[in-house]
Structure formats: structure tokens, C-alpha cells
């Protein structure tokens, strides 16, 4: 009994289903039995078919194989019934066909392999070429088999003069092969004159034979073995001072290279320390005179040493002498005719330097030359047949050019020159060892080892390149010439807007946490985030043209988005200024800050816009000392303010007026490019002679080190302490007649003079007359008459107290040079000058100042008097006592005297010993030091009331509980950069009482006369504005309070000063006072968040 019989028996015994009568079931059973067991033998059992139809195979149902349509497709599903035996891979026939095909392929490959093995060297090249250019390998194998038969036939019929038919077939085959060669050869890389060049398939140059080695010069293994010159000084003709060269190279690698990563630092240093070859080598080199001079020209913009100026004392000529040498090399040495990797890199650096000097037209030409040459040598293509190090150098150079291109496109509003359809090269690899090398801020005073951290240069560069890809697509759509002046349609714009917005959000989400903007972050990371927010402004700025009714963005306000991101750029710029300083920043920051300031001007007179535009023009003024493009940016903002009829804040207007008078109306035509004749800098002392023994020692040491670790500059030149320049290293008397040293600066701790006391009294009277906010700006911007910026500090005054290893310009040997040059370091000073008398700290306020005679010294650094108060008390040993007003007047004198030192490009960070220093440079606090030292000294049981009369650049810490900060009684003048706001008392008890008293007074005044009531309200408003101004433009941060309870109310203690009004938190965002925390009136109300 089979399974169908069992099924039929079970169906007969089964009870009827619901809704069917037994009679119906009984009557239905014979019909089923009849249909299954009919007289037709074909219906008794489903026949087995070898191939089911495609529809049944897809449904995984049984198919009866009927033609033209099976029963399932015809009766049940009504689908098209198609049979395809070849699509069923389970059939034996299919496997048989595959087996035959594999045998044929095996025979073809066997013929080709045997032909290559048995052919001569000349014929092997021809066979390989035919294999590469063929359409079918079987035809090549058949052709080779016929050739072998023809060769056999020719040997058998030597006497026959009649050509054979296969010979004519071979001629025909060669003709067809030529057609294929012409059609299939798409491009190749070839070496010409020692460099790799790419020739495309449409060029007939591709069929030229490879150049022979006979025309090339033999490779020169020995480099300056008998020359009397330091290898480092062979790269430039401008100076023969090795310390100056190393100093400027370190400036470049410390501040510019991390953002514009366009070369392999390890390969560059490998060739840099060997010196310039005596002749043109055949092998690829990663250092050239053109590249070094371009680096030195850029490095001059981050330093104020004597050798950085082409004309002593003229900041407009920084780096011009090295740039002129680079231009000379391009023209006279025909560098533009020799496509090389180093030339691509040098031209890119020269382009961005020209932009920083306000010569965009020339910089655009240099960038175009760089990008064209990059494509000429095939950097945009993925070439895997080269050495790994060369492949890495080519990739990092291309992606560096890619970043340069996108920055240029954003800067000039032009289309990218390297769009994504022109390259297929992968991104460069991240080497953990290289990214783990420590980075620390480098200034004219040396390295700040307290801020060292992993550099992560390559990892950051990859993130920036991804962001530039988004920027490229944004520019190509919204800023394409075909899109300007006419819309592409709202639907297309919204679709592209949504895509780019999503990509920007994904980039931000996928960004590693270590690259978040935070206190102590790397400078290139901060600039990268500024570029990220700039893309949002560029993305939504085209939608500002729509009115609210016609805007395709119903629930999105483009102006608000642009404002938010402009505010973020301003916050990041303040963070950069706090962590480092704006004298050492890439010039791309000028453009990004300019974009943000433009949005701020549209939002005037809003409070946040007034704050940000004021800080923006002050920051641009600081950057203008090193980057002439910032001077023109200030002029543009001044012109726009008049054109748009915008009322700028008073302090911003004063800054613009001052810069207009100092720099004039900046014009590109007024900034000539340096000529091609580079002025030579005569060294202050003769360059040390190099003997053959010294050269041999250098070569031996270098070879030994390179053999151990050939491509790691940090391991190449390890040094126990940070090296430093000697006193005679960079100072050049012939170039700087007016040298400003720290000893020439007045003593900031000297007491005030009567004239300053009178000025202070005048300030108080103006404050009482409700004119404080006007005179406050005037005091802030009073300074000495403008004069050329002389920052030529000799390294005699800039030695670091930790740098003790002796290397002098006159006694430095080759081995010393190798031991002291690091990827981030410079040679050290001589022992004779490293004494206590000549040691100068990294910070100007730590240096020994001359004492003014006939005047007693005042207390320099304020001490925290009582817990929770901002009133500065003198130490017990002091013989004088000072009122808060006198202390503030002392600060004003300090600010006036320390104006010159504020512009120095030396130390930026506050040392723990001077956490409450009042110097102009120390207007911020280090967060870690603040809470480590300040918190333990607070009395958690209650403290004194914080006041607004801080005498320093910062507000002292207020008590976390107990008395409240005095927000209205005593408003501090600005001191150096503005008196810090009162430290936040935790509770609002006294503030609430004070507020109640004020309300009672207002009620009494209201009962007297309506006119007096209006006058009182106006005075109160002006007083509150002055209060907000004092804290708004005070120190970046006051001492913060903590959560506490006072008089039945719980509130967040106030960290006064800076951008946080009194009563603000001071805890949540105490980096640079980025967000406005707390009540806007400073009366101690429950604070909110920005």
C-alpha cells in the first residue's frame, strides 16, 4: 500500500468538516477516487520529469513537465510556463558542458605557458603583449599553435620557395593584432628623466619606445663627502645658518603640515639630513631645494625671529626671501619642466602661501601647476607596481593636493580642479607608529612639553579628505556656473540638499571620539571642525534668496542654520586662541572666520552677533600681523558694514578704524610678489667648516641609524630633552637694527602713576553717569602709537630652562647634527649661555623685569583673600593696602605696559604657579589646574560674597555656598583685558534681597511721579547693560561655583566674567565661555542654557 492509498483511507474514515453534511462528504469521496484512479494510466501516478519549468522551480512546487504548459501553470497559477534545461545546474548535461569548457581553457593555458617557457627572451615580450591586448585567449593559443606548425613545415620544406598559406594567415593575424593594440591600450606609466609620467590611451606618445639608461646620468651615491658645507644648508642659498633652517622647518611641520598633509614626513627627513646631491640622481628623492625653500617661506609666518623677515621689522616681508629663491629655482632651473613629486608638493605650498599674502591670482596659478603636474605623473591613478614607500608617498601627495584644491575652491568660489571622476587612487594608509609620535606646541621659546599628545596626523588627514569630498559635490551642484542666476528646480535642490545634509551628519557621527572639539585638542582638529561648519553655511546660504512664503524648506530656517554654524566657528576660534594663539595658525582660518563674521553682520544688533563680530575683528587683527590676507579681510568687513548700513559694536568699530589707519585700504595690486632674486642672509658667524672626517662620521652614523629604523624621524633623532637654539644661532645683527627683548619691557608689577589714577577716577565718574559702556571700549583700545611690529627676540633671551644640551653653530659636528635634528626638534644652545642669568621662561610674565626706581613695587599676582570672594587682598608682607579701584587702576597700567608682550609668539599656557596671574596673556584658566588647586581651598560650609571687582584678567573663585556674588554694586573696569566677573556665590539669597530692595525703591519712585519712574527704568536698563558688558567683555572665565543651597533656594553657583554673565554656571562650559549660562541680567536668577 502506497502513501496515496493511506491518504485516501484516512480521508474516508475522517469525520466531516464543519459546515458540510456527512452526505456531502460521502458523495464527494467517489469523485476524488475517480479522478485519482481513473482509467487513464497517465493519471494514476505523476510521471517523473528531468527538468521542471522555471515557474515551478521558483515556487518549489512539483511540475508534470507537460507541453506546452504544465498543469500547475495552466490550471492553478495561470503563469507563463517556460522550460530552460541549461539553467538547471543539477542536470548532468550542464556539468558535462562545464567540464568540456574547463578542459578547453586548460588546453589554452597549457599552450600559452609552454610557448612562454620555450620562447626566446625577445619572443616572450611579444607573447605577453599579445596576451594583454587580446580579446580571446583561445585565438592567441590557436595563433601560437599555427606558428609552431608553420615553423615545423618550414623546416621540412627548406627547398621550397613558395610561401605557405599559414604565412598569409599570420600576416592577417598581425594586422588584427595591431587593431586590437590600437583599441585596447588605454594608458601606462613610464619613467622619463628619473620621474614617472602617465601617458593616456588617446595619446600617440604611448607607442614611443622606453627611454634607455644611456642618456641618464649615473647615480651619485656619495653626497658632499668632501664639501666644506653643512648638509642641511645645501638646500637653500638664502642662508647658511643651519639653526635657522631647522627652526623654520619645525615651524612648518608643527603648524602647517598637520592640516595640509601633502608629503611623507619620514621620507622627507631621510633625504633632508643627507644634504643636496652633487648631481641629479636617478633614484626618486623626496627632498629638493624648491620644496625646502617653499617650506621655509611658510615657516616664517609662524615665527618672529630675525631671519624670518626679508626686510627687518616689516611683517609684510615674512618669508619673501625664501619665496623669491623658490621662484628663481622654478624659472632658472626649469623646475616646471621636470615633473617630480617634490615639485608638486612645493607648488602646492607656494600657492597657499601666496593666498595668505593676499595674492590669490598668483596662488591660483601655482595651485593649477601643482594639480596639472600631479596628473602628469599619474598621482590620480592607482598604481600597484611601484615600491610600497613610493606608492604611499604618491597617495599622500595626491590627497594633500585634493585638500588644497577644495580649500582653493571654497576660498575663490570656483569649481574643483580635481573632481571625483578624475581619480581612482585609494586613500593613504595610517601608520600607527607615525601617528603615535608626540606633538607639542612649538614657539620661538621651544616646545611646550606640558601639552604633548599623539599627533594622529594621518588619521586626521583622512577625515579631512572625506569632508573635502562632500565639499566638492556641494560646490559642483549649488555653485556651478550653470546654477548661478537660475534655479535647478526646487525638487532637485531639495533632493541634493537632503543628500549632502545626510552625508555631513554621517561624517560627524562617524568621527572618532578623540577628534571631538574639546579643551587641549590638536589645532588641526579644531580647524577641521571649523571647515565642517563652513560647509553647512555654504549648503544653506543659497536658500537665503527665498522668501518665507516661497521657500522650499517649510520647517527649516536657512538663516538660523547659517547663524548657528557661524556661532560654532566663532566658538572654535576662541577655543584655538585659548589653547594656542592666533599668531600661529594656518591662513585658511582667516577665510573661515571671515565667512562667520559675514553671517554675524546680518544678525546685528542681536547680542550674540555683537559679541561674535567683536571677537572676530579682534582675532583678525591679531592674525593680520602674520597673514596680510587678514588685513584685507578687515577692510572688506569695514566696507560691508557701510554698504549694508550695519551699526557695528563700538569696540569692533574701533578695531576696524585702527586697522584701516594702520594698514590702509588693502589691495592686491599693492602687494607685489617677491622678485626672483633672493636676498642672501649673511650669517652672524662663519659656517662651521666640514672636514672629510666629519663627513665620514656623519655618513657612518646616518647609515647605522637608517639601517635600524629607516623611516621614523622620531627614532632617528632621539634626544633626552627638547633641544633648543643657541644664542648666536638665528640672531643676525645685520638684519634687525631694532631688537625688542624682554628686558626692554616695563615692569607690569610697578605701581600706578598719578595720571593713571586720574584716569581711573574719570572712569568711575563716567560709570555713575551711565556712560560706562562707552568709555569702557575707549579704555580697552587705548594703547601705544602704532609702529612696525618688531618681534626680533634674540635667542639669548629665549632659552628654555630645561634645554641644556650643547650644540653651537661653530662647534656642531655631523654626528651632533644627526643627534639633535628631530621631526619636531631643533639644535640646542651652547653651555656657556645656559645659566641662570640668561634663562628666560616660556612666558613673558615669568621673566625677570627691570625695576622702576623711586616707586615701590605692588603685589603682582592677586591672592585669594577669603573663601568665595573675588576681592584681591595683598600678602601679609606688603607694606601698602589697595582699594579695589586702586587695584583696577594698577591693572590698567599693567595692560598698557604689557601690550608689546601680548603680541609675542612665545609661550601661551599658564603655569600652575600663576593660575591667578593678571598679565594680559594669562586671561584664561587651565581647567585641570583650576579644579585641582582652587576646589580644595574652598570652604564648603559657606563663603564670602563674590564681587565684581576682580583685579586680574580673570575672576577669582567665589564661594560655593553662602554669600552671593555682587552683580550690581561695583562694576570692574577692564584691567588688562577686562576685569573678571564676580565669582559665583552659590545661593541667591543676598541677590534676592538686593533685588527686592531695588523693587521697593522702584515702587517708591513710581508713587512720586510718572516721569521719575520712566527715568528710573531707563537708568536701571543702562546699569544692567553696563553690568552685562563688564562681565561679557571681562575675562574669558571667572571662578566657578558649584550647586548649593542658600535661603531656601537651590541654584547653580555663578562663574562670573567672560561670556558667562554673573550667576552663570562656570562648570558646564568653562572652556572659553562659549555658551551663555545663567540669567542675562546677572541678578542671580535660575540659569538656563544657551
UniProtKB/Swiss-Prot annotation:
Biased composition (Gly residues): 940-965, 976-988
Compositional bias ranges of the Basic and acidic residues kind: 167-176
Span list, region Disordered: 1-43, 145-176, 666-689, 773-798, 825-875, 936-999, 1033-1053
Residue stretches of biased makeup (Low complexity): 849-859, 990-999
Subcellular location, principal: nucleus
Disulphide bridges: none
GO molecular function: DNA binding; DNA-binding transcription factor activity, RNA polymerase II-specific; zinc ion binding
Record carries keyword Transcription regulation: yes
The organism's place on the tree of life at top rank: Eukaryota
Subcellular localization(s) per the UniProt record: Nucleus
Database matches in Pfam families: Fungal_trans, Zn_clus
Compositionally biased spans, kind Polar residues: 1-14, 666-677
GO BP, one annotated term: nitrate assimilation
DNA-binding region: 53-81
The entry's keywords: Activator, DNA-binding, Metal-binding, Nitrate assimilation, Nucleus, Transcription, Transcription regulation, Zinc
GO cellular component terms listed in the entry, alphabetical order: nucleus
InterPro entries linked to this entry: Transcr_Regulatory_Elem (IPR051615), Transcription_factor_dom_fun (IPR007219), Zn2-C6_fun-type_DNA-bd_sf (IPR036864), Zn2Cys6_DnaBD (IPR001138)
Annotated function: Pathway-specific regulatory gene of nitrate assimilation; it activates the transcription of the genes for nitrate and nitrite reductases.
Domain remark text: The glutamine-rich domain might function in activating gene expression.
Full protein name: Nitrogen assimilation transcription factor nit-4
